[in-house]
From Swiss-Prot:
Membrane topology: Peripheral membrane protein
Primary subcellular site in the record, as a coarse category: plastid
Name assigned to this protein: Phycobilisome rod-core linker polypeptide cpcG
Subcellular location: Plastid, Chloroplast thylakoid membrane
PROSITE patterns found in the cross-reference section: PBS_LINKER
GO cellular component terms, A-Z: chloroplast thylakoid membrane; phycobilisome
The protein's assembly and partners: The phycobilisome is a hemidiscoidal structure that is composed of two distinct substructures: a core complex and a number of rods radiating from the core.
Keyword Transcription regulation: no
Family of this protein: Belongs to the phycobilisome linker protein family.
InterPro entries found in the cross-reference section: PBS_linker_dom, PBS_linker_sf, Phycobilisome
GO biological process, one term: photosynthesis
The UniProt record lists the keyword Endoplasmic reticulum: no
Biological role: Rod-core linker protein required for attachment of phycocyanin to allophycocyanin in cores of phycobilisomes. Linker polypeptides determine the state of aggregation and the location of the disk-shaped phycobiliprotein units within the phycobilisome and modulate their spectroscopic properties in order to mediate a directed and optimal energy transfer.
Length: 234
């Protein structure tokens, strides 16, 4: 029997506060939807917005596109919600995001990108990670996309977006999710070995031209002995 989503308390976030803003001004996010029968160019923008939301700006590459899903969406064979579901379950998304993160971080990333809000607290992160580890990534994605929260905010035809990132009452907006939660976490960076370690090694072995060994320097005899030693095994 699968474990249901555990209870977690809510916290105050911008999207849970009543809005007194004027619709259509600069503080409102641009909505990409298929409700108004979009043209071909408008459909291109909708597809691009979906990739940008799910894959983030750092991963919008031609290699990551799913032309089969795009074709289905263009010919109204699937809804925007199903297109979002397909991107989340695609092999490229799994390789780029799921395989390089732990369950907690991956759950946080998906909540931000699918529901358009930040996680409320660590309890919510744990609750979603339990769904992920006990029921698998497909059931986890289905739970997010089929949730009541997704239905009320985006429905079948609207691309998810970061809700109320900029509000009129504040001079600065919240950090975009693609910058707040990038692809790699600090723990994976340590396992991966980032380039600065290689740079440090290169800097330590670099010899400026003015202090290079001259004829008679013992360092040259060390290099010569190494060449003689390894020449026996060639």
């Amino acid at each position: 029997m699968a474990i249901p989503l555990l209870y977690y308390p809510y916290s105050s976030q911008n999207h849970r506060v009543n809005s007194f803003e004027i619709k259509g001004n600069d503080e409102q996010p641009r909505i990409f939807s298929t409700d108004s029968l979009p043209t071909s160019s408008e459909m291109d923008e909708i597809i691009w917005a979906a990739y940008r939301q799910i894959f983030s700006e750092h991963q919008i590459l031609k290699f990551n596109r799913d032309t089969y899903l795009e074709s289905q969406l263009r010919f109204n064979q699937i809804t925007v919600r199903e297109f979002i579901r397909g991107l989340l379950l695609s092999e490229r998304f799994r390789i780029l995001n799921y395989d390089v993160n732990n369950n907690y971080r991956f759950s946080e990333m998906c909540v931000q990108r699918v529901l358009g809000r930040d996680i409320y607290n660590d309890k919510e992160k744990i609750a979603w990670s339990i769904v992920l580890c006990t029921r698998g990534i497909k059931a986890f994605v289905d739970s997010l996309v089929n949730s009541k929260e997704y239905e009320e905010n985006f429905g079948d035809n609207t691309v998810p977006y970061q809700k109320r990132r900029v509000i009129f009452q504040r001079s600065k907006g919240e950090v975009p999710f693609n910058l707040k939660t990038p692809r790699y976490g600090s723990d994976f960076k340590e396992r991966l070995g980032m380039p600065q370690y290689a740079w440090q090694g290169a800097i330590r072995t670099f010899r400026p031209q003015e202090i290079k060994p001259r004829p008679g320097d013992p360092v040259l005899y060390l290099d010569m002995s190494r060449e003689l030693l390894f020449s026996r095994f060639r």
